[in-house]
Amino acid sequence: MIIAIFLSLIQIILGTQVRQFVDEQAQLFYYDKSKWFNKIPVIYEYHRTFSIAVVSINFFLVYLNNKLSLGNKYVNHLMILLLIEVISGVMMFYFDFPFGTQTIHLVFASLIFGVQFYILLNNFLIKKTSNDIQV
């Protein structure tokens, strides 16, 4: 889970750089959203490609959760959040930023990070509790 949180944090940082680029393009081209990505910056390519790593590591966590019968329902909820996050990102790029997609993308990125952190803390608590019981 620590690796997933670390990757998500990097992805959020890359996303803020993409957002900065979009804001600069919005100032240049105003509301002509079709021109915002005429020249795709390298940081966007990193952000888009790195999302594959983020989804993959979280999918692996779901796989482990199910295979080991850990019963952590929050890991499955995390995949739903990731799916919505990816869909909103794809919609922003291919459909010229439909209304609300930026907000959804930002809010769900925060939710994903929060749920991952909650799962991590919960795992530490379970481990501590099981160690206390064994002593």
What are these regions (language model features)?
Residues 1-135:
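Polytopic transmembrane helical bundles with strong interfacial aromatic enrichment
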